[in-house]
């Protein structure tokens, strides 16, 4: 066996497609391009995402909106944290000891009856109360 005698296995290779070489080849006349029109011309390229008239995937799927970068405050009802209302000072840590909220919380808003009375006790700028008296 020598390198010059090596051949690929029978049927493992295909002849390249030779278009436009007569009707008998099966790839003559229109050269595998179908009939007339834009798609038969040279330089034709379908738009990215074009699916032949079918509604494209990017139009079939629903829009996904953006999420705001401005953090919304975590809202807590004053009635749920009555123990905190009795304290002299209200801080984020004192609320955390009584009420669970996500660790990613940057601001807390206290709402409900009595929230405005707590405004003087709050010693943390990350905590606010509802505006109603």
UniProtKB/Swiss-Prot annotation:
UniProtKB keywords: Ribonucleoprotein, Ribosomal protein, RNA-binding, rRNA-binding
Keyword presence, Ribosomal protein: yes
Transmembrane feature ranges: none
Gene Ontology biological-process entries: translation
SUPFAM superfamilies in alphabetical order: Ribosomal proteins L15p and L18e
Subunit relationships: Part of the 50S ribosomal subunit.
PANTHER family recorded: 50S RIBOSOMAL PROTEIN L15, LARGE RIBOSOMAL SUBUNIT PROTEIN UL15M
Protein's name in the database: Large ribosomal subunit protein uL15
Source organism: Wolinella succinogenes (strain ATCC 29543 / DSM 1740 / CCUG 13145 / JCM 31913 / LMG 7466 / NCTC 11488 / FDC 602W)
Lineage: Bacteria, Pseudomonadati, Campylobacterota, Epsilonproteobacteria, Campylobacterales
């Amino acid at each position: 066996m020598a390198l010059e005698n090596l051949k690929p296995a029978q049927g493992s290779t295909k002849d390249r497609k030779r278009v436009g070489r007569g009707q008998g080849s099966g790839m003559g006349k229109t050269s595998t391009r179908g009939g007339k029109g834009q798609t038969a011309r040279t330089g034709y390229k379908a738009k990215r995402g074009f699916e032949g008239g079918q509604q494209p995937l990017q139009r079939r799927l629903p829009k996904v909106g953006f999420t705001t970068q401005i953090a919304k405050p975590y809202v807590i009802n004053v009635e749920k944290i009555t123990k905190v209302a009795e304290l002299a000072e209200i801080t984020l840590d004192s609320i955390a000891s009584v009420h669970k909220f996500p660790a990613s919380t940057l601001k807390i808003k206290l709402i409900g009856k009595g929230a405005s009375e707590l405004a003087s006790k709050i010693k943390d700028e990350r905590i606010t109360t509802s505006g109603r008296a």
